[in-house]
């Protein structure tokens, strides 16, 4: 055994003392620090915010460094992502700048289950499952009424709140980010949001539980070349309710679809396209750039895209009308043709 291992573990344990009040609680499953002085924890009632003066930026960096050394890893501007296990068996995801906002550090701890649940308890509510004798009928789609009436503000508001996967399409300068910000404002405040951007443009209520992740390339003057795909994978370990990816450009589109299809519903993103059909086509072609998709036929990937993306909203900037930006098309997979 490495003689330094006990000292490394002791260093991690020492820096974890600031989190002991929450790590020691059996009813807490997740602990997240989005910025210094503040943490969020998830219990049976959902997410809760707690202020903590002990969680200074220096302390968080010291904890990150101690954790990296304990795992024989590095965390620094050149390697700003760390997925590891703590001495107590907890899983941790740490993100430091430039992969997150300057002056912050993102820390997500997932506590292991301390109890093995019997099947009888896990399946206690199985009678509510569709298809089981005695089960309730499928709920009607609340989006169909505003869809049929053409009440598009109500439709999109309900779509966000229902966790539909939404793609905003349009040309450069058409107002895609503006609409995405408006849609993001309808996300219920109880949710935890992870955003992924190359430049900070998405604006969320400072009081909500969210983390902004940033990617870039060496040519953009960033110290670390962290890709959107790497941040998507890291985001999945950060207990997100939903993931917002500012723009889809390449193979990361497949990772985004995988995230939306793996229990993280309600994803929102944008792409450059002039119509809903072109947006779905472009998204399919982006997926083909992913290493795991290069041998798959177009039809298979197109079917995946249409099974995951619920809604496409097309925005346009029309010259000659005061440079007016407006929604010109909405495609809803489960709806009737738009009136």
UniProtKB/Swiss-Prot annotation:
* A Gene Ontology term for the protein's cellular component: type IV secretion system complex
Q: A GO term (biological process) for this protein? A: secretion by the type IV secretion system
Q: Which SUPFAM superfamilies match?
A: P-loop containing nucleoside triphosphate hydrolases (SSF52540)
Instruction: Report the domain of life of the source organism.
Output: Bacteria
Cite the GO molecular-function annotations of the record.
ATP hydrolysis activity
Q: InterPro entries annotated for this entry?
A: P-loop_NTPase, Sigma_54_int_dom_ATP-bd_1, T2SS/T4SS_dom, T4SS_GSP_E_ATPase, VirB11
Q: NCBIfam families attached here?
A: VirB11
Family (UniProt) = Belongs to the GSP E family.
Q: What is this protein called?
A: Type IV secretion system protein PtlH homolog
Q: Which organism is it from?
A: Bordetella bronchiseptica (strain ATCC BAA-588 / NCTC 13252 / RB50) (Alcaligenes bronchisepticus)
Q: Gene for this protein?
A: ptlH
